[in-house]
Amino acid sequence: TNGTAVLGLGDIGPLAAKPVMEGKCMLFKHFSGINAFDIEIDTTDPEEFIAAVKRIAPTFGGINLEDIKAPECFEIERRLVEELDIPVMHDDQHGTAIIASAALINAMHLSGKRIDEAQIVVNGAGAAAIACARMFLALGARRDQITMCDSRGVVTTRRTDLNSVKREFATDRPV
């Protein structure tokens, strides 16, 4: 982590994010027997972060990214997946998307509907929300039936303040 997006706390920096990272390490050990080590990297520059992870990667069997702000987290994860020969996971994206997808699948089962019939509202447009929306698409949801909201309202094609990741889910439907 670089501590730029700690849940409920925001950008608190790498040292302040240490307790969260230590807690994740305990969960890895307790539930899977995997020894994990917290590593806090003191930079907000994606290139520096990527370079630091690449330098230490040979020591580890996998990398779990955590609490890195969007949209930088997407580029960091993409590059590390491409450039390293060990598994790389961004917990804020993938962990949340897995749980939300399980809930969506269950809701579809209980309602007797198919996922491609669902009208889905994603409240948020950060790393977790984007990953959830992408996972919903992979499960069969229709892009034109996903409405994403951020702190400024519905993410629409008419807005000029969207980064490239938010534009992926911008809607042109009247909402």
What are these regions (language model features)?
Residues 69-70, 94-95, 153:
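Short, glycine/acidic-enriched loop or turn micro-motifs at the edges of active sites
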